[in-house]
Structures are given as structure tokens and as C-alpha cells.
């Protein structure tokens, strides 16, 4: 697995900035704020800025310095490690739930999935190094700060990693329309589980699907016969959360 050591990133917006400032995972390089902007007046952001050296905060009048995205008047530059080296928690936690992305190529979808997964209490995201959206600034931006609280594992072979998970007592659930598929709510996710979702156009690859212990599907009644991968992921990860909360 690859680790991006001290790679520098830039994000904009109040939520992203606050999340990064409050995290101990990253080194802050610079915070740029437009004077009298929404960000400049935000109490939560100003409180979070007290956590860093104020010399790193620069207030400017020129709005053109933050012309991309909907910035709300703030950008943050930071560095750090986003990708974890190993599955260090596997021996400790008996109800881990991981999300596995099999060649999800759209950065917007990747970012939205991160946000959804973090809200649903997913413990980590595994994704392929090749033929997948990289963990870049667009992905981080769309996640709205959720990436700060998520572990990421970049792998070269999804199928091999799933087999490793099986050896660590994980059940593998693939989300795919299939004759053998069961409704997503009829599968148990309260034990160690890895949920696999596929690419936007092609779904889960055949060999990866063959590795799964269960195939889940989301029944539909409309004329449109498919969901966006982000929407489909949302349904299954929140079902996982519902079962865990019900079990407690």
C-alpha cells in the first residue's frame, strides 16, 4: 500500500477548514480568509483558528484570490498522511464495517461516498490504486471535511484484499443487481463486514463479485433501473448502522 507522506493539499469552505483545524492528523501551512466574508464572521471558524499559530492566518481584501468553488471566503493549505499503511484495528474491533470501492472513477462520487460513510460510522474505505479516482483535492472538497475522520487504504488488488479480510473473519457483501442477490435490508451487517460497491457504469467486476459471501440489491419500482453509486452506497451503509444501533 502507498502512503502519501507530507503531501500538500488545499481545501475551501467553512466546514472543511474547521474539520482540518480541529484534527491532529495534519500540519497547517496557511489559512487564507477574505475580510468581511461569511468565513470572517463565523464564530465556529474563529474559535477553531485559536488552535493554531495566528501567524499562519492571512486576511485579505481581494476576493479574486479565492475565485474557485463556493469558498465562503476561506481556504486552507495543509499537509499530512491521508492513507493508512495497514489494517491495524482488525484484531481489536469485532464489529468493524469497511467500505470497498471497486473502481469508482468519479471524484464527485468518491467525495460524496466519503461524507456518507463517515456519517454512517464506517470504519475505513479501501479503494484501488488503478482505474479509480485518486484521493485528490476535488474528492476532499466534496467530502466537506468528512475525510478527516476516515481511514483510507489504497490497494493494488481488491480481490486479494477481500481474501485477507475473510481470513480476519469478515463477511464480504457486494452491492449488485444479480439473480442471486437478496434485498439489502435482509442481510446482517452487525458482525465484521466489508461492503463492496462497483464503478458507476460497470458495477463490481466478476472476479471481485465471486469473492463476496453475499450479494445485496436494492429493489426498485420506477422506470429507471439503477441508482447513482453514491445513493446506493448510502442505502446500504445506513442499513448497517441501523442494525448496529438496534443490536446495542
Label the predicted regions.
Residues 19, 49, 58, 87-182:
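RNA substrate-binding interface of SAM-dependent RNA methyltransferases
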Residues 36, 62-63, 130-132, 200-202, ...:
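Short, acidic/turn-prone active-site loops that include or flank metal/cofactor-
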Residues 44-45, 132-138, 202-208:
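Short, glycine/polar-rich helix-capping loops at beta-to-alpha or helix-loop-helix junctions
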Residues 173-228:
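Active-site/ligand-binding-proximal alpha/beta "capping" segment
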Residues 1-88:
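N-terminal positively charged helical leader segments and presequences
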Amino acid at each position: 500500500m502507498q502512503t502519501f507522506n507530507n503531501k500538500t493539499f488545499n481545501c475551501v469552505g467553512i466546514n472543511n477548514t474547521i474539520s482540518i483545524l480541529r484534527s491532529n492528523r495534519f500540519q497547517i501551512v496557511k489559512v487564507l480568509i477574505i475580510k468581511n466574508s461569511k468565513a470572517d464572521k463565523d464564530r465556529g471558524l474563529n474559535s477553531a483558528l485559536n488552535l493554531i499559530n495566528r501567524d499562519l492566518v492571512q486576511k485579505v481584501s481581494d476576493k479574486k484570490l479565492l475565485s474557485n468553488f463556493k469558498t465562503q471566503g476561506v481556504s486552507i493549505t495543509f499537509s499530512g498522511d491521508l492513507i493508512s499503511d495497514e489494517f491495524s484495528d482488525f484484531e481489536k474491533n469485532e464489529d468493524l464495517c469497511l467500505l470497498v470501492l471497486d473502481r469508482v472513477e468519479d471524484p464527485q462520487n468518491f467525495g460524496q461516498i466519503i461524507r456518507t460513510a463517515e456519517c454512517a460510522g464506517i470504519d475505513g474505505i479501501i479503494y484501488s490504486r488503478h482505474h479509480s479516482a485518486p484521493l485528490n483535492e476535488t474528492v476532499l472538497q466534496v467530502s466537506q471535511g468528512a475525510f478527516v475522520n476516515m481511514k483510507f487504504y489504497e490497494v493494488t488488488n481488491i480481490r486479494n484484499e477481500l481474501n485477507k479480510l475473510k481470513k480476519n473473519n469478515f463477511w464480504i457483501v457486494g452491492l449488485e443487481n444479480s439473480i442471486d442477490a437478496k434485498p439489502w435490508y435482509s442481510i446482517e451487517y452487525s458482525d465484521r463486514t466489508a461492503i463492496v460497491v462497483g464503478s458507476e457504469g460497470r458495477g463490481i467486476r466478476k472476479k471481485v463479485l465471486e469473492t463476496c459471501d453475499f450479494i445485496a440489491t436494492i429493489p426498485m419500482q420506477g422506470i429507471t433501473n439503477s441508482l447513482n453509486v453514491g445513493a446506493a452506497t448510502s442505502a446500504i451503509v445506513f442499513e448497517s448502522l441501523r442494525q448496529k444501533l438496534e443490536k446495542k
